[in-house]
Amino acid sequence: MGQDGERPEWRLVIHGGAGVIERARMTPAEDAAIRAALDRALEAGSAILARGGSSLDAVEAAVRVLEDDPHFNAGRGSVFTYDGRIEMDASIMDGRNRNAGAVTGVTATRNPISLARRVMEQSPHVFLSREGADQFSREQGLPQEPPAYFQTPERRRQLEELRSRPSAEHFDVHLKYGTVGAVALDQEGHVAAATSTGGLTGKRWGRIGDSPIVGAGTYADDRGCAVSATGAGEYFIRVGVAHEICAQIRQRFRATIEEAQRSVPNDAEGNPTFMVHASEMDFPAGAAQEIADGVMDEVRELGGSGGVIVVTPWGDGVYSFNTPGMYRGQASPAGRSVAIYGDERQAQ
C-alpha cells in the first residue's frame, strides 16, 4: 500500500544482488554508478507500467537494463566459471497463468532474460539448457555476442583471486552477488517476475543455482505474489524460496478470498458469474513483509544468505535480506527510489 493507504495503480521492485555490500568496500564512483544503473532500470520498467503496459513487459525491460551494465553479475559482467567460461542463467514467469520460461548455461545471448521469455512464448518447453538453449536463441534471431563482450577485468580478477586459494576454498556459495531481478504489478492487477545471473564465481561441473529454477529463484502467481531472489542458490533451492513465499501469502489469505467468492451469484448453470481476484481484496499491511522475512529466516537457519524482492496483487512492494546490503529499488506512481546498504530506508 502507499503511504496514504491507497492501493497503487502499479508497482515495480528490482534488485541487483545481495551480499557483503558495505560502504567501506565501495568507492564513491562505484556507489554512484550502481545507483544510476538501478534508476535506469526503474525508469525502463515504470515507463511501461505507467502507460498501462503489462507487468511481464516491465520486468523484462528492467532486467535487460541491468544485464547490459557490467556492474552486475548478469549478461555483460557475468562471472567466470572455474575454466574461464561465461555460463548465464535466467527465468521469467507470468502471474496471470503461471506460464514460465528458463534457460541455463547460455554462452552468447546478449540478454538471457529475453531468451527465457522466448522459451516461454515460442517453445513448447519451460526450461532449456546449454547448447540447446544457445541453438534456440540463434533460431529466434536474438542478438548474439562474442565471449569478450561479457568478460570484464573485474570478473577476471575475482576468478584469479579464487584460483589462488587452497582447493578446499574454490567453491563458496556465499561469493555470489550481483544477480539481477524484477517483480511488478500492472494496472490490470497482474504480477510477473524475472531473474538473471552469471552464477557463481568459479562454478564447476555445470553447476546451476536458484535463479533459473521456477519456484526457487523466480515465481509469480496472481493469487499470491511475484518473487525474485538472489544469494546462495544452493540454500534457496533447498527451501524453494520463491514458491514458499507465494504459497504462504496465498494460504494466509485464502479464507478471505473464498469467503468473498461465496457471495458471488451463480449463473444459470451454477457457475460463479465472476471470480474474485486477490487485487480486489484489502489485506493487512505488513503481512507480505512478515512472510518474506520468515522464509529468509529459514534460509539463514540452514546457513544461507541473500535476499528477495516481492510484489503483491494488492500493491505491496517489499525487500527481505539477511546480508549487509542489497542493490535495490522500487517505483510506483508516487516516484522512484534506490538503495544499496542495509541501513538505508526507502519510501514504500
Where on the chain are the PLM-derived regions?
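Alpha/propeptide regions of enzymes that mature by internal proteolysis
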Residues: 2-348
